[in-house]
Amino acid sequence: MKPNLAILAFFITSAVLADGPKDNLADNVRPIPPPGVQVPDADKTRLTEGLAKLRSAIDEATKAQSKHPLLADLLPDVEVYHKAVDWALRYNEIHKLAEVKAADQALAEGLKRAEALKEGKAPWTQQKGLVVRAYRSKIDGSVQPYGLVIPDSYVGAPVRTDIWCHGRGETLSELAFVDQRAKQVGNVQPKDAIVLHPYGRYCCANKFAGEIDALEALEHAKKFYAIDDDRIVMRGFSMGGAAAWQFAVHYADLWCAANPGAGFAETAEFLGGFQSEDVSTASWYQKKLWHWYDATDNALNLQMCPTIAYSGEIDKQKQAAD
């Protein structure tokens, strides 16, 4: 995880949170993500030892399969478990003690995959149901997770695929996300369709690196699954709805349809209506940069992408759908 949130302060943070004007005061800004809980020493020692064991297994698999044609695309599927646990401990991002168990399970799954990869096998690529995958980002070389829901009916024929952008979650560390994607189907599960859940660099509404991450996750998934390019749907709710709006207007040619839910589509209106901000006092460069992701600026592109927006009738974020 660990994105540099400083660059988002003037733009994303206030737009995603509902804290209002008081959150513009430096002394009032909450740390994001919040500090984690105190992990018992015994658990920390066990997890640290598990990390060392997994790191060794990853190195052995890498050496044994150095000439494997798919090594570069399969290795992140193993490394993602090491990174998730390592960063959770390193950056104090275990936010509840139940995540200690999730860390143990992540290390076990990582070790299982490493041992299989050492033998040149990758059984998770044939797995149905919930599948945790990962790829190496072209932006910074980091391993980034994403989740898949593979229907039982999938046999390798071209299939509809829905991309679901997740909502706000300040404690959604990479460990929490990997655990979630291994255990929860999620908000949507269309019949006979694959669902792809991008992590999108934590809680930034798939902006900046999070934007490219969703596209890279799709690119990686296409290497292993017969995704029908004519049946890819862009979806999301709340903060994920905001992401769906931007993807719909900026990449209208990639989707057969878009389905944003309760997500802001333009910054000034959202800040004023949802957070009671006085946007008239914003600097010229803030207002200029808002247009980077203001979906209304490129709404004409929706002629190429059928779009159905939805929201609760008393939700202030209904403004975007209206």
Where does each model-flagged region fall?
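A domain-start/cap signature at the N-terminus of enzymes
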Residues: 20-37, 91-159
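Amphipathic, heptad-repeat alpha-helical segments
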Residues: 20-78
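Gly/Ser-rich "nucleophile elbow"/oxyanion-hole loop immediately N-terminal to the catalytic nucleophile
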Residues: 153-157, 206-239, 249-255, 276, ...
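Active-site machinery of serine-nucleophile hydrolases
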Residues: 156-225
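Mobile cap/lid helix-loop segments that gate and shape the active-site cleft of serine hydrolases
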Residues: 169-181, 253-300, 304-305, 319
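Short beta-strand immediately N-terminal to the catalytic nucleophile in serine-hydrolase-like folds
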Residues: 234-236, 259-261, 310
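Hydrolases whose catalytic domains are alpha/beta-hydrolase-1, hotdog thioesterase
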Residues: 243-247, 259
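Conserved strand-to-loop "acid loop" that flanks and positions the catalytic carboxylate
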Residues: 306-315
